[in-house]
Amino acid sequence: MPISKIITYFASQNKKQSARATLLRNLQCSSLGLYRKKHKRAMKDKYIDLIEQTFDFPQDEFTVEDNELNFHDIPLMELIKQYGTPLKITYLPKISQQINRAKRMFNVAMAKVDYKGTYNYCYCTKSSHFSFVLEEAMKNDIHLETSSAYDIHIINALYDSGVIDKDRYIICNGFKRPQYVENIAQLINDGFENTIPVIDNKEEIDLYDDAITKKCKIGIRIASEEEPKFEFYTSRLGIRYNDIINFYKTKIQKNKKFKLKMLHFFINTGIKDTAYYWNELSKCLNIYCELKAICPDLDSLNIGGGFPIKNSLDFSYDYEYLTEEIIAQIKNICTRNGIDEPHIFTEFGSFTVGESGATLYSIVNQKQQNDRENWYMIDSSFITTLPDTWGINQRYIMLAINNWDKEYQRVLLGGLTCDSEDFYNSESHINAIFLPKLEPGNPQYIGFFHTGAYQESIGGFGGIQHCLIPAPKHVIIDRDKDDNEYYTRLFAKEQSYLSLIHIS
């Protein structure tokens, strides 16, 4: 057979096979289309299906009953019916749970390596200054960290009300202006013997020498090196590694008023399993060992804060491993240098209070601005109620509160202010937001969860808000010790216009 006929034959066979394949694909697509039309209601396109297929759900703090979301077994729709939206809530039991969780992890880690020092948990007041937060936290035999002059007034108020005694550790961080120094000195002079001002700069020690009349404990903050991708090489806070030993010898060693008890170490990135973190921790420990050799009074290492909080339903962080590794490394380096292990202090703010908070909104309008962008407008502002969402692009767990049995769609969330930055358009696990489709006469509510840290202080609680958007109601939730039933109380009403326009 001529070669040309052979080529023609195989070409015709290929065309037939291609035609068959095309026909088969068309039949499959047609059948799938008919199937989808026939079984549309049975398809897994509901909001609850999306969540269950994307995450391991339900989770400890999130469950769904009758297509409505519960938070720590609290039916959120009941809160909304009682208090309305926008609404901030604080679930107090979570604060104690977090504190005791950290205590347990550090104590277990210490026991595993026969660590001789003690663990001391400090709460950072700047994370949330509210009295109900501080009172709940202090039930757990912990200590406090301050960052400004006004914090000292909080310490005095807690003492006057019997919440704390004078034996609690008060760790005073930050750059000290004259009023802060004066208040710290007054605290020490009044008998708060475990108040430890942490030296941030070399001139600070002279201010205490003038203001404090009693012997006192002090600490030194190390100016740690920043992460390589950060804008700066070295932290602006603290004293340089190379200057610490000489600073101790010239300013502290011969001054009988002061005892250097603590070396303070903090990494802005938080506690992470990275070469950068372990390298900085190792450098800190080497300085501690070198300083301990000439300063017998030194017996405490403050590793600051840095435990993250859950900001997604697929959040993953091995708290136990990191805790055990930190303690093991401290133990090993101290053993190699022949010195006793230090007492460990941590300063947890967000970890303490962050997961206790939630912020609830109503969807008040839907705006289809083009073929792709469908806006759900909330009844408040992200800039005023969750300022970290636009300030540092913080992502939170965001979930529908009701209508979990409805179909979902991709949306953008918009706030009420005129600011172009007042929006929320992505979650930590995906660059998109999905919520139930709206239906006439069926209100939609949404919640942002684990919002309990910093948002009120950064947003300016009680003050003027952007575009004069009022601060929302704030409700406190607790549980009865006898029957574990939850109860609520209104901490703050929605902000009045009188407070917004008040001038004097």
Model-derived segments and spans:
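N-terminal capping/small domains of soluble enzymes
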Residues: 35, 39-179, 431-457
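Active-site-proximal beta-alpha core segment in soluble small-molecule metabolic enzymes
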Residues: 119-300, 309
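Short glycine/threonine-rich loop-to-helix capping motif typified by GTGT followed
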Residues: 272-279, 310-322, 353-365, 460
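Charged (often Lys/Glu-rich) extended helix/loop segments that serve as interaction or gating elements
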Residues: 325-327, 331-504
